[in-house]
Amino acid sequence: MTWLLAITTMSAFAQQATVTGPDSFLKVNVSVKQGIPVYSVTYKDKTILEDSPLGFIANVGDFSRDMTFTGQKENKIDKTYTQDRIKQSQIHYQANELTCTFTNKEKKNINIIFRVSNNDIAFRYEMPKYGDTGSIVIEKETTGFDFPSFTTTFLCPQSDAMIGWKRTKPSYEEEYKTDAPMNVRSQYGHGYTFPCLFHVGENGWALISETGVDSKYCGSHLSDATTDGLYTLAFPMPEENNGNGTASPGLALPGSTPWRTITVGENLKPIVETTIPWDVVEPLYPTEHTYKMGRGTWSWILWQDGSINFDDQKKYVDLAAAMGYEYVLIDNWWDTNIGRERMKDFIDYAHSKNVDVFLWYSSSGYWNDIVQGPTNYMDNPIIRKKEMKWLHNIGVKGIKVDFFGGDKQETMRLYEAILSDADDNGLMVIFHGCTLPRGWERMYPNYVGSEAVLASENLIFQQHFCDEEAFNACLHPFIRNTIGCMEFGGTFLNKRLNRNNDGGSIRKTTDVFQLATAVLFQNPIQNFALAPNNLTDAPQVCLDFMKQVPTTWDETRFIDGYPGKYVVLARRHADQWYIAGINAQKEPLKLKLNLPMCTKGDKVMLYQDDKKLNPHAEEITLKKNDEVSITMQAEGGFLLVK
């Protein structure tokens, strides 16, 4: 631990505390070494994290060095809760809790709370009031994650601030590198966005993220690694939000930081199935509204800006009605190209087809150069509340708010304010061009999704992203989508990604691959990339599946896969299982799958690519208990519906 050698202050002795998960396999050791609070993590006695620093530097004192371990207490957590909008509807969370008290040389205390379940660690700092001091500014966290040198990484770089379209980055849309060594500098030199996946050789896997971020803190990310494999928690860059607002979060005392989470397993199953983002947070406000999840159409993804007019939007309402979908999303420029006066007429037309409406807004404000309208409605509370009341009165069911400015506390306040005001008016909210959701499905009852990923629009913009579509799609179930909703906006049935299905980017993946992503990518409101022409030019088997696919799930199980190569998941909606797989490799992949939800004699519907890569569906009878043999074509997929 070379980072320890630079510290010369020695404590008289190193006290230690240990907490394990209920099954005792996952263990956290906490101690003080050379005045620095540290923790380490093992799973089944194999090292996941070596001694890693804890603490922070604040305006009220330094809690990163010259610290003494002065107390500890233990507790057990056992709670059951229900949650819509995530990968599982019924959750039983059991964990052992350890509270460690550390005292700095000024005799000021902090508590570090660890909650350890069988495969998850969540920890945070709690600060009391210090005399008459009623607030604190956290200037820097020294929280670290020190991996063994042989660890490889699956990470998405943090971009420069104020770059990209109209200076709107960072927005969690950079390209991943897989199985990369730790000692390579990130693309921009700013570290990596959460969540961060690590393969600790034969010792196992670890996923690092955070949850419970609201208006009282900023969003964080990981730094670049030191030569010793140490990543530390990094705050937003000062340049974010066009330089407005501080990068250092402030909060009232007593107070606490968000939870930082580490999910650990000897394989990828605990990573994919984790519910830790929601286990340690609680709803922030009740709602008097009933929000309906479902599927939608949106013209912008294929027909782009020119389609935001009354007549084209009616075509997408008709498409939604033909598919039995609940929603249509009207994207940017509706305020000028359709007009506020005609919007009520449009919504009345949609309602006549049993389709409800989402409308797009810019987050607006003074932090980028966006001109697409509507602008200057969401950043000002007086204007925002008036606008949302109007939306409620004309029958709009939700909004999609785009182009945020970064991860500073100032922006987190805006996310929360939009959500809270929207709930007052019965509006659901999707975020786009945005930060990562951090437990928000449980915290905010009207939150229904975030992009925060290199999403479907990029397939339209560049052929490169079509060429890499299968690779990227085989990453998301292991990384981005495992910690929160992912509003991807995909499932294309056009072969060519333009309005007339005759030009633009060429889709490389098969139709069944596209169908499988409707199950693999989890978001409670799914705006699919279908087009009106698909009603006549897409295979009927694809349309039939897309008419019945759900968007909410009661259970999710990892079946098989490796990030960037292939993935197979099983999701249950009510009493029906959807087992979906995709293959990113350039040759067919034969798999013998263990499916505990299947038994000999079950009749299931199998969707596969034939040898000409055309979709084919047939009912088959399973010949064995728990086992099915599948072949996925190159850049193809399969589905089993039971």
Question: Where are the regions a protein language model picked out?
Answer:
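Bacterial Sec-dependent N-terminal signal peptides
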Residues: M1-Q16
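Edge strands and adjacent loops of beta-rich recognition modules
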Residues: T82, I86-H92, F545-L569
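An acidic-aromatic substrate-binding cleft motif
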Residues: A252-Y327
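Catalytic cores of secreted or luminal carbohydrate-active enzymes
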Residues: V512, A516-F558
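Carbohydrate-binding surface patches
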Residues: Y562-K600, F638-L640
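C-terminal beta-strand-rich structural cap/linker in extracellular carbohydrate-active enzymes
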Residues: I620-K642
